[in-house]
Each structure stands twice: as structure tokens, then as C-alpha cells.
UniProtKB/Swiss-Prot annotation:
GO-annotated molecular function: N-acetyl-gamma-glutamyl-phosphate reductase activity; NAD binding; NADP+ binding
Record pathway: Amino-acid biosynthesis; L-arginine biosynthesis; N(2)-acetyl-L-ornithine from L-glutamate: step 3/4
Organism (species): Vibrio cholerae serotype O1 (strain ATCC 39315 / El Tor Inaba N16961)
Family recorded in the similarity comment: Belongs to the NAGSA dehydrogenase family. Type 1 subfamily.
One of the Pfam families matching this protein, by short name: Semialdhyde_dhC_1
Catalytic activity field: N-acetyl-L-glutamate 5-semialdehyde + phosphate + NADP(+) = N-acetyl-L-glutamyl 5-phosphate + NADPH + H(+)
CDD domains attached to this UniProt entry: AGPR_1_C, AGPR_1_N
Enzyme Commission number: 1.2.1.38
Name of the featured protein: N-acetyl-gamma-glutamyl-phosphate reductase
Catalytic site positions: C154
Free-text function comment from the UniProt entry: Catalyzes the NADPH-dependent reduction of N-acetyl-5-glutamyl phosphate to yield N-acetyl-L-glutamate 5-semialdehyde.
GO annotation, biological process: L-arginine biosynthetic process
């Protein structure tokens, strides 16, 4: 049994991870932690998240001594803020822990990226270079061998799973950048109360226009520029991404279908919709649903995921399963 610790356990993704660790036959939950100054320190996880009552009654502890915690675990999930993961990941790695980081602190291998999009200067270039990007369906071989997995972001997961099969097969005319319009549930903003996620204030609206940090993450890992506009939806969870692309000259609908089939024929967590995907079919699941329509030289691909699961926690667990050679669906379905 792999002793598994979750840092940032009080948040939505932390609670989802705790449930998956509880279900996993090869993992045992060794600790739940939050920052030293968190108001949640000392409370049980069941107090914070009623859905785990009767399953996980372990207290959420303040993280005050990283070395001691590291000595008592094999695996660490970091469901923490970007700058916190930036500081913690190298400490756990130095103690020989396997790290799965759900923040953006190690996703893009460019130090110049971080001051612009995350507001801090990256101090760990050696781990930035070694970290493997945790887009499970596309990076499995690298995930198997790396001690540091930077789990892909929520919007980037929904977007890349929709675009990569066509891009890899050369079916897209990239002189016309793919246009991604995506809507996320309010849980993507986290659990902390703000005006943005207040019940009476939430409305369908765009944000981060031309400057959202996920745009360069998507573009970097696709290898082509994109136009990305995120929207806040007035619902709890899920992401729906609608992506418009120009097909290369002469590309047929059959070639499109074959590209998707080839990319995901042995990937159990990507499903093809009979029509076009909808959030209600993927919320509370680890799946990504894809559907598309072709008209002339243009294609619209629609992608739906649960932002807290395939966009965060379940993809992290999927990466763990891949890394250790467990069945990919273990603890996920």
C-alpha cells in the first residue's frame, strides 16, 4: 500500500482526491493537510465536506513540518495555490516522494512565463525542466517514469483533448488559429467566498480575455497558437468548450473521424457523443466527452468534462495509476 498525503485537502479538489484515495485498493490515506494559517486546520474532513461523512473522518492538519510529513508518505498530491506548490514540490521531491501537482507551478517549461501569468519568479528551474505534463491520454510514457507530474489544467485538458488528434494528423490549417470558447462552473474559482462566486452575483460572463494563463499553457503543449476565451457559468461544476478550426485543404469528414478514433481507441476515459456533448453527462465522472460537426473547410469540436475531476483530481489519480502500472480506471469509476 502506498502511503498517500494530500496537501490542500480542505478544497473541492482535495476532497475529491481524498475520496479516490479511500476507494483505491493500492493506496492508504496517511495525512490531510492545509496551510499553517488555515481556518480549517483541526477540523475533520467530514465537517468540511459532508459527502465524506462515514467514510473519511480524518482531521485536516496544519502543515508545519514538511520533512516530517514527507518521511511518512510515498505519494503527495498538491491541491494547493500555484506559489505554494512551487515551494513545496521540491521539498517533497528531495525526500523521495512521488509528487502530483494540481497547480500550474510546473506546467510550462519557461521561467519567463511565471512572472507574467502567475505573478512570481520561478526558483526551481531544475524541476521545471524535469516535470512531466500530466495530460494523461497523451503523455502516458513520460508519466510512467517521472517523479514529478504537473497535472494539466481544466480548460487545457478540455481544449487539448479536442484539438490534438486533428493537429497530430496534420488535418488543421494552423494559419487560422483555433478559437476556443469555454464555460466553467463556479467551483473552478475555488471554495473561498468572493464577490465573483457569490450566489447573487454569478452570471454567465467572459473573463481573462486575451490574458488568461491557460492560453499559453494550451498553445505551448499544442505547439500552435490559439485564441482562448473563458467564461464563468452560473452552475456549480463542469466545463463545456466549443472549438472552431479550419481544416487543411481536402480534409474529409472520414479523415476527421479516423483521427479521433485512432487517438482514443484505447483510451477508456474519452468518449464520443452521438450528438454534441453536454455537461450533465460528464459531471461527477472522470470522462471527457467529444463531438464534432464539419461544414466545408471548418470544424466545430465540442468537449465536456467535470472541471473538478477530469480537469483536476481524477486526472491526477489517472496519472498515478499510469505511473504505478495500475489499471487506469482504478478508483475512478
Amino acid at each position: 500500500m502506498l502511503k498517500t498525503t494530500i496537501i490542500g485537502a480542505s478544497g473541492y479538489t482535495g476532497a475529491e482526491l481524498a475520496l479516490m484515495v479511500h476507494k483505491h485498493p493500492q493506496l492508504t490515506l496517511s495525512g490531510l493537510y492545509v496551510s499553517a494559517n488555515s481556518v480549517d486546520a483541526g477540523k475533520s474532513l467530514a465537517q468540511l465536506h459532508g459527502r465524506v461523512a462515514g467514510l473519511i473522518d480524518m482531521p485536516v492538519q496544519a502543515l508545519t513540518d514538511v520533512d516530517t510529513v514527507a518521511a511518512e508518505c510515498d505519494v503527495v498530491f498538491l491541491a494547493t495555490a500555484h506559489e505554494v506548490s512551487h515551494d513545496l514540490a521540491p521539498q517533497f521531491l528531495a525526500q523521495g516522494c512521488q509528487v502530483f501537482d494540481l497547480s500550474g507551478a510546473f506546467r510550462v517549461q519557461s521561467e519567463a512565463f511565471y512572472p507574467t501569468f502567475y505573478g512570481f519568479a520561478h526558483q526551481h528551474s531544475e524541476w521545471l525542466e524535469k516535470a512531466v505534463y500530466g495530460l494523461a491520454e497523451w503523455n502516458a510514457e513520460a508519466i510512467k517514469t517521472s517523479p514529478m507530474i504537473a497535472v494539466a489544467g481544466c480548460y487545457p485538458t478540455a481544449s487539448q483533448l479536442a484539438i490534438k488528434p486533428l493537429l497530430v494528423d496534420g488535418l488543421i490549417d494552423t494559419t487560422q488559429w483555433p478559437v476556443i470558447n469555454a464555460v466553467s462552473g463556479v467551483s473552478g474559482a475555488g471554495r473561498k467566498a468572493t464577490m465573483t462566486n457569490s450566489f447573487c452575483e454569478v452570471s454567465l460572463q467572459p473573463y481573462g480575455v486575451f490574458n488568461h494563463r491557460h492560453q499559453p499553457e494550451i498553445a505551448t503543449h499544442l505547439g500552435c497558437e490559439v485564441i482562448f476565451t473563458p467564461h464563468l457559468g452560473n452552475f456549480k461544476r463542469g466545463i463545456l468548450a466549443t472549438i472552431t478550426m479550419k481544416l487543411a485543404d481536402g480534409v474529409t469528414e472520414q479523415q476527421v473521424a479516423e483521427a479521433f478514433s485512432k487517438a482514443y481507441q484505447d483510451k477508456p476515459l474519452v468518449r464520443f457523443s452521438n450528438g454534441l456533448p453536454r455537461i450533465q453527462d460528464v459531471e461527477f465522472t472522470p470522462f471527457c466527452d467529444l463531438g464534432w460537426k464539419v461544414q466545408g473547410r471548418h470544424i466545430i469540436v465540442v468537449s465536456a468534462i467535470d472541471n473538478l475531476l477530469k480537469g483536476a483530481s481524477s486526472q491526477a489519480m489517472q496519472c498515478l495509476n499510469i505511473h504505478y502500472g495500475f489499471d487506469e480506471l482504478t478508483a475512478l469509476v
